[in-house]
Amino acid sequence: MSYVDEVFDLVVAKNPAQPEFHQAVKEVLESLRVVIEANEEKYRKDALLERLVTPERQILFRVPWVDDKGQVQVNNGFRVQFNSAIGPYKGGLRLHPSVNLGIIKFLGFEQIFKNSLTGLPIGGGKGGSDFDPKGKSDREIMAFCQSFITELYKYIGADTDVPAGDIGTGA
């Protein structure tokens, strides 16, 4: 079995139920197959592909907030810091009910390549929550965002991780 196939099988085994992430990794690995196979032993020795497809950090946290009826709601928050080889993590925050760890990993993995093509010294990351801003009041959105950032700020900063807007953030 080739190194590319071994790494893809490892990704699937270590990240079950994350089909979006599997698809992104498969596409990138297939596009690199010819280059990797020409120098397979060197890349294998350096664990290049394993380092490429494994996030440096996966941060999962709860986001409690109070709705307009005074009820406490709890959403899931995520930040995947994928690769900082060329600079601080950079990537958007997505707020949508479909958000889960697999989707954030898929988007963060792709962000590595998008950011590297800018020529700027920034790495790749992505974050978000399964919070749905649709139908929420401005006060509810503010309560959620304040709670989300209160947790996330521990892991971000100009030299560490620079979040940006994405779907559901008004960006």
What are these regions (language model features)?
Residues 1-171:
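N-terminal ligand-binding/catalytic initiation module
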